[in-house]
Structures are given as structure tokens and as C-alpha cells.
């Protein structure tokens, strides 16, 4: 018997991606709401309560409203907004977070999908805090470079029009240092302080890399880049969607340059360490529309339903057929999520 799945907010980036992931599966029955009834609370409630799994791809306020419409105790809600990511009543949707996280995802009927920047940040920081290398009160500064697909249909259209020279260079944003991912970055990494976090949008569709600088002399213990890489490798041993590169591995670079888009079209996160015993950087790379959004949501669903965790997902990018891309179809405002 197929699992019944409903996507509330299927016209946005994450919703469209979810439909792409799920539409070819024979173990999923997609519940389709009529286009003219998508904003009808009564109709939405009917579909939400009929589903085994309901994905919410909505702004925070709308997600909270949708949750209030669900009274079926058997419906698992997987929410892609920022509304519940630090709530004790919701399982954080990062199966690789810590031992026991998959069990929590299997047992929970409320799952909060991590933000794209936060996913990369937490994958870097949680192992280092757990290992006692990075003190909880360490003053973290993080930089994230991301593609423009996170900015929604208008931003995608602006970049595709290519008539604004300002869009050709990287553009920092969220300079008030109040980005909506900060709470989950702090809580899920077990930090005492939120990081100083600067995201930057670049002139490419998708791909994301978060980089954090570390001064070993200010850490709880003196470590080398190789030590940090070993911590990552040990922490994520056996994780099919986490790939840890050897420290200072030049083979991961392109003539000395880092490829932010190297994990695109996968559900993979790649972790790197570069530097010396005096100073180093750690970097996590992922597809902001994959492991940073819809791919993570599907992975959580797979874990919850007890099916193969990799169903619908890719560790390596599939070979694409020839033909034009449709980037505008991948659009909805995600920088806030």
C-alpha cells in the first residue's frame, strides 16, 4: 500500500522539488489539491489530515496556521519553514546530527527541516563542539556563498535578464546580523552564542558553501587540520550523504580554486579542512535546493517511514539529458528559510 503524501505550498522552490523527487515513486500516492482551492483552509485541512506525511513549504506564519489545521494524530508533518527548528517538540531534520537522531525522526510526527545555511554550519560545528575542541562560547564567524535560486522568482528573473551589472559581482546580505538561521545554528551546534554570520549571493543558480575560520591557539585543545578532518571522518563514519575530504587535499580544488557547485544535484554534503597549525578554515558544501531543502525533507520522510533512506536521492549527480534548464520553475523565497 502506498503512503499518502500531501505538499502544502507545492508552487514554490521546495514544493516543486519535492514533487520532482516523489512523483516517480510507486510507494507514494501524491494527494493533489485543486489549484483554486490551495488557499482554502477547509480544503487544505482535508488534505493535511488525509495524509500519512504532509510537507509544509510555506512561510513561518502560514506553516503555524497549517499545523493548527491538523488533528489527525497519525499525520507526520515535515515543515520547511524556520518556525519550529528550535522547538523541543519537533525533531530537527538532520539525520546525521547525532547518534539517536534517526530514532527520533522515526518516532516523531513533527519534523523541522533545517535551513540550507544552517545545515552546512551545523554539520561543521556540532562534531567539533561534541569533541570538546571548539568551546561552546567560542566567537564563531561564518561566511556563506550561495546561488541565487534561494531568492525566489523575482531574483531568478533578475539574474537571468542579465541587464543589471551590479548582479555580476557577489552581493552580501543580512548585514544587520539577524539572519533567520541564527537560532538553529546556535541551538543545534550546542553553542552558547550565535555566530557572526555573513551570507553572500553569487551569480550562479545553486550551490552553497559555508566557511568558518578557526585559530587553534584559542580552541580547547591544540589541533592540526588533519586532526579536524579525522574528527569529521570519525563523527560521520558510515554516513552515505556526508563526504569528508582529507585535510589540505589539493585534488579537491580546481587549480587552487574551490568549486561551490561541486555537490549540486545531489543530497550530499562535502566537508573540507584547509590551513595550518596556526590558522585554518573548515568548509561545508551542499546543493541549497537538495541537501539544503527538498532533498533533506525527502530524507527525513524516508527515515520516518522506515524505507531506504536514499530512495529518490543521489550521492552522485545524475547524468543530465541535453536540453534547456528551467530555473524559474525552481523559484520561491528561500533566503529566509
Swiss-Prot record:
Q: Which reaction does it catalyse?
A: N-acetyl-L-glutamate 5-semialdehyde + phosphate + NADP(+) = N-acetyl-L-glutamyl 5-phosphate + NADPH + H(+)
Domain of life here?
Bacteria
Gene3D superfamilies assigned: Dihydrodipicolinate Reductase, domain 2 (3.30.360.10), NAD(P)-binding Rossmann-like Domain (3.40.50.720)
Can you cite a GO biological process for this protein?
Answer: L-arginine biosynthetic process
| Subcellular location per the Swiss-Prot or TrEMBL entry | Cytoplasm
The UniProt entry, under Pfam families, shows:
Semialdhyde_dh, Semialdhyde_dhC_1
Gene Ontology cellular-component terms for this entry are: cytoplasm
Q: Does the keyword NADP apply?
A: yes
PANTHER family attached to this UniProt entry: N-ACETYL-GAMMA-GLUTAMYL-PHOSPHATE REDUCTASE, CHLOROPLASTIC-RELATED, N-ACETYL-GAMMA-GLUTAMYL-PHOSPHATE REDUCTASE, CHLOROPLASTIC-RELATED-RELATED
Stated role: Catalyzes the NADPH-dependent reduction of N-acetyl-5-glutamyl phosphate to yield N-acetyl-L-glutamate 5-semialdehyde.
Q: Which family does it belong to?
A: Belongs to the NAGSA dehydrogenase family. Type 2 subfamily.
Put simply, this protein is called N-acetyl-gamma-glutamyl-phosphate reductase
Amino acid at each position: 500500500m502506498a503512503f499518502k503524501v500531501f505538499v502544502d505550498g507545492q508552487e514554490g522552490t521546495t514544493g516543486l522539488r519535492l514533487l520532482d523527487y516523489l512523483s516517480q515513486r510507486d510507494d507514494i500516492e501524491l494527494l493533489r489539491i485543486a489549484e483554486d482551492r490551495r488557499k482554502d483552509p477547509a480544503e487544505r485541512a482535508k488534505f493535511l489530515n488525509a495524509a500519512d506525511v504532509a510537507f509544509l513549504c510555506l512561510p513561518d506564519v502560514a506553516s503555524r496556521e497549517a499545523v493548527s489545521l491538523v488533528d489527525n494524530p497519525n499525520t507526520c508533518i515535515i515543515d520547511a519553514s524556520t518556525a519550529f527548528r528550535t522547538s523541543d517538540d519537533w525533531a530537527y531534520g538532520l539525520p546525521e546530527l547525532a547518534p539517536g537522531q534517526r530514532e527520533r525522526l522515526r518516532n516523531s510526527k513533527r519534523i523541522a527541516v533545517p535551513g540550507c545555511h544552517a545545515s552546512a554550519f551545523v554539520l561543521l560545528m556540532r562534531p567539533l563542539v561534541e569533541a570538546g575542541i571548539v568551546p561552546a562560547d567560542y566567537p564563531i564567524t561564518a561566511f556563506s556563498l550561495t546561488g541565487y535560486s534561494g531568492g525566489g522568482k523575482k531574483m531568478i528573473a533578475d539574474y537571468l535578464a542579465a541587464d543589471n551589472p551590479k548582479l555580476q559581482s557577489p552581493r552580501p546580505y543580512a548585514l544587520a546580523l539577524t539572519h533567520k538561521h541564527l537560532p538553529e545554528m546556535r541551538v543545534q551546534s550546542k553553542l552558547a552564542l550565535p555566530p557572526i554570520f555573513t551570507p553572500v549571493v553569487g551569480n550562479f543558480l545553486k550551490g552553497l558553501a559555508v566557511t568558518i575560520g578557526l585559530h587553534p591557539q584559542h580552541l580547547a585543545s591544540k589541533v592540526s587540520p588533519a586532526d579536524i578532518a579525522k574528527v569529521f571522518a570519525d563523527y560521520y563514519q558510515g554516513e552515505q550523504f556526508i563526504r569528508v575530504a582529507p585535510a589540505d587535499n589539493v585534488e579537491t580544488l580546481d587549480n587552487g580554486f574551490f568549486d561551490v557547485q561541486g555537490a549540486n544535484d545531489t543530497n550530499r554534503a562535502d566537508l573540507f579542512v584547509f590551513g595550518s597549525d596556526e590558522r585554518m578554515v573548515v568548509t561545508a558544501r551542499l546543493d541549497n535546493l537538495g541537501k539544503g531543502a527538498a532533498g533533506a525533507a525527502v530524507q527525513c520522510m524516508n527515515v520516518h517511514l522506515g524505507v531506504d533512506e536514499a530512495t529518490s536521492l543521489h550521492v552522485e549527480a545524475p547524468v543530465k539529458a541535453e536540453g534547456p534548464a528551467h530555473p524559474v520553475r525552481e523559484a520561491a523565497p528561500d533566503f529566509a528559510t
